């Protein structure tokens, strides 16, 4: 069944294939265009460098008028990521716009890795370390980067 949300997701997928952003990839799961699997590679020159972080993106039939739900499947230590992998990012909540597509969502999350918002912490321990003890924060991030290599 073709719906506006499904047609839009097909366009998003086509755009992602034709003009893939650096360091991110995503595709619908095999038998459900409303659920995507994605990967974000840790940005160069950041504590997340060399990490391979898996995510799942779930869309409703109200997409693109409503944002998708995005969660890290890979373990993540970041001020704006909850323990269950949910991401605290304004464009996935109150600043959502139907002009955003899968590509822009993934690149925004990739940027968030290096530029957390400590004023909106989802993980207070990570936020505190990020602000008060960068070296310890980076050590914890290094551990999850190494762990990401073994995630299958």
From Swiss-Prot:
EC number, as in UniProt:
2.3.2.23
Q: Which family does it belong to?
A: Belongs to the ubiquitin-conjugating enzyme family.
Query: Sorted alphabetically, which InterPro entries does this protein's record hold?
Result: Ub_conjugating_enzyme, UBQ-conjugat_E2_core, UBQ-conjugating_AS, UBQ-conjugating_enzyme/RWD
Keywords assigned: ATP-binding, Cell membrane, DNA damage, DNA repair, Membrane, Nucleotide-binding, Nucleus, Transferase, Ubl conjugation pathway
User: Which catalytic residues are annotated?
Assistant: 88 (glycyl thioester intermediate)
What GO terms are given for molecular function?
ATP binding; ubiquitin conjugating enzyme activity; ubiquitin protein ligase binding; ubiquitin-protein transferase activity
Family annotation (Pfam families)? UQ_con
Keyword presence, Flavoprotein: no
Q: So what does this thing catalyse?
A: S-ubiquitinyl-[E1 ubiquitin-activating enzyme]-L-cysteine + [E2 ubiquitin-conjugating enzyme]-L-cysteine = [E1 ubiquitin-activating enzyme]-L-cysteine + S-ubiquitinyl-[E2 ubiquitin-conjugating enzyme]-L-cysteine
Return the protein name.
Ubiquitin-conjugating enzyme E2 B
Role, per record = E2 ubiquitin-conjugating enzyme that accepts ubiquitin from the ubiquitin-activating enzyme E1 and transfers it to a E3 ubiquitin-protein ligase. In vitro catalyzes 'Lys-11'-, as well as 'Lys-48'- and 'Lys-63'-linked polyubiquitination. Together with the E3 enzyme BRE1 (RNF20 and/or RNF40), plays a role in transcription regulation by catalyzing the monoubiquitination of histone H2B at 'Lys-120' to form H2BK120ub1.
- Pathway terms, separated by semicolons: Protein modification; protein ubiquitination
The organism encoding this protein is: Homo sapiens
Give the domain of life: Eukaryota
How would you summarize the oligomeric state and partners of this protein? Interacts with RAD18, UBR2 and WAC.
Question: PANTHER family given for it?
Answer: UBIQUITIN-CONJUGATING ENZYME E2
Specify the enzyme's EC class, one word.
transferase
Q: Point out the gene that encodes the protein.
A: UBE2B
Task: List locations, semicolon-separated.
Answer: Cell membrane; Nucleus
Record GO biological process: apoptotic process; chiasma assembly; chromatin organization; DNA damage response; DNA repair; ectopic germ cell programmed cell death; in utero embryonic development; meiotic telomere clustering
Q: Residues in domain UBC core?
A: 4-150
Q: GO CC: one term?
A: replication fork
């Amino acid at each position: 069944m073709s719906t506006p949300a499904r047609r839009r997701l097909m366009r998003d997928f086509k755009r992602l294939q034709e003009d893939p952003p650096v360091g991110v990839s995503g595709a619908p799961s095999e038998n459900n265009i409303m659920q995507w699997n994605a990967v974000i590679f840790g940005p160069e020159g950041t504590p997340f460098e060399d990490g391979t972080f898996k995510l799942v993106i779930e869309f409703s039939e109200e997409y693109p008028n409503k944002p998708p739900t995005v969660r890290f499947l890979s373990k993540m230590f970041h001020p704006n990521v909850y323990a269950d992998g949910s991401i605290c990012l304004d464009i996935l909540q109150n600043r959502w716009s139907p002009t955003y597509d899968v590509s822009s969502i993934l690149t925004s999350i990739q940027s968030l890795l290096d530029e957390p918002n400590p004023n909106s912490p989802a993980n207070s321990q990570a936020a505190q370390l990020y602000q008060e003890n960068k070296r310890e924060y980076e050590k914890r991030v290094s551990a999850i980067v190494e762990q990401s290599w073994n995630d299958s």
